[in-house]
Amino acid sequence: MNIYIGWLFKLIPLIMGLICIALGGFVLESSGQSEYFVAGHVLISLAAICLALFTTAFIIISQLTRGVNTFYNTLFPIIGYAGSIITMIWGWALLAGNDVMADEFVAGHVIFGVGMIAACVSTVAASSGHFLLIPKNAAGSKSDGTPVQAYSSLIGNCLIAVPVLLTLLGFIWSITLLRSADITPHYVAGHVLLGLTAICACLIGLVATIVHQTRNTFSTKEHWLWCYWVIFLGSITVLQGIYVLVSSDASARLAPGIILICLGMICYSIFSKVWLLALVWRRTCSLANRIPMIPVFTCLFCLFLASFLAEMAQTDMGYFIPSRVLVGLGAVCFTLFSIVSILEAGSAKK
């Protein structure tokens, strides 16, 4: 990979993170209304995902340009995990007060969910520490065995366990909230947290794919399994969002319904990464360099929809939160474009 292109792909996640923080701060300073509180806090929290994606980009690009660096393989996942833990603590702090307001309740749950995603993405960074083994293993055969440089089976299973456990936590928590969906804050927080949990579940497939390909244990059975898994979760999340929008006339349905649809777009962006790794595993795919266009389209979908919603929010404040949050989700999708491009450069056969 060209060193200048490498730096561009490293900078994209940081720039997108700064945009989320800047827009979130601007929204918070604009008004003290509850809609501004929720949108501003959620936007700022999305920077944690961008930070985690930056650590992933840095680790892989460094290997492509300079080879494996043990120090980077340790430092950058720690940075990503630190950002995710801080985000989860921030979300929990909003929920820990004695008299939690509705806006704090919703924002706290969403921010905690964003922190969970950041932790899963940081696990992608941690599992990518020996990314160069993937094209090497793909050029060989399963009979070659596990390379001595690869993670042990125990470490690999521990890495996969991180998104699995966070997915279970998010699913149980969101279902608990939805059991009292007659309470509006529970209804909103439960649906959005369930969508965030779907993203964590998608990242199970990505981490498992990277770990198994690195260890040369990527089986024929799971070759397309994770692709189906991620596309299924993305589609279910989009359908859930549509259901929320059409199942009621209450304005409270607008934010979770619209945001769920765009969380599905993030799932599709993750699908592009899982699909790419599956396509180039022990085969040649002439269209592999087109796959990075998927997160570009999902990014544009989020941003264009946000622009329409911003106009609608002038007359109906129910559209205000999604019109702002979707900008941050679009930034995350564009950050995923840089990651998919890096994976394509590192793993596709030219």
Curated annotation (Swiss-Prot):
GO terms for cellular component: plasma membrane. It is found in: Cell inner membrane. This is Inner membrane protein YhiM. The keyword Membrane applies. It is a multi-pass membrane protein. The chain crosses the membrane at residues 3-23, 42-62, 75-95, 105-125, 158-178, 191-211, 226-246, 258-278, 291-311, 325-345. One of its GO terms (biological process) is cellular response to acidic pH. It comes from Escherichia coli (strain K12). Coiled coil: none annotated. Pfam families: DUF2776. Residues 24-41, 96-104, 179-190, 247-257, 312-324 are periplasmic. InterPro entries: DUF2776. Residues 1-2, 63-74, 126-157, 212-225, 279-290, 346-350 are cytoplasmic. Keywords: Cell inner membrane, Cell membrane, Membrane, Transmembrane, Transmembrane helix.
